[in-house]
A protein has these predicted regions:
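Non-heme di-metal
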Residues: 1-117
Length: 117
């Protein structure tokens, strides 16, 4: 994996997605195969499960890439609820505020609000 290479956010996400793809499609399946051949069925199962997680990472990174390429990071087609990750200010609209009206942090601090409780 390339170390010490810092590109743009888009380039970094593309590289990360490619790395995750290699991990879930080649590396971990190979590790699982070797473990199985050596009689370590539990370890082989663990590697297969890790492969599943790595595939999810690739999907997430590719979704982030698409958001950047289609200018959908801080703008959505329909109204959504945006939340400032610094202070918690909530805004409803198609775009996140350029600056948080509560704490004055820049737009980069906004994300689509999630309720995972």
């Amino acid at each position: 994996y390339p170390a010490g290479v810092i590109g743009t956010t888009l380039e970094n996400l593309q590289a990360a997605a490619a790395g995750e793809h290699e991990e879930w499609s080649a590396d971990y399946p190979k590790f699982a195969q070797i473990a199985q051949e050596e009689g370590f069925a539990d370890i082989a199962a663990m590697y297969r499960n890790i492969s599943n997680a790595e595939k999810g990472h690739e999907e997430r990174y590719r979704a982030f890439v698409k958001n950047i390429e289609t200018a959908q990071v801080f703008a959505k087609e329909g109204e959504v609820v945006w939340q400032c990750r610094n202070c918690g200010y909530i805004h409803t609209g198609k775009t996140a505020p350029k600056v948080c009206p509560a704490c004055l942090h820049p737009q980069a601090h906004f994300e689509v609000m999630k309720k995972n409780w």
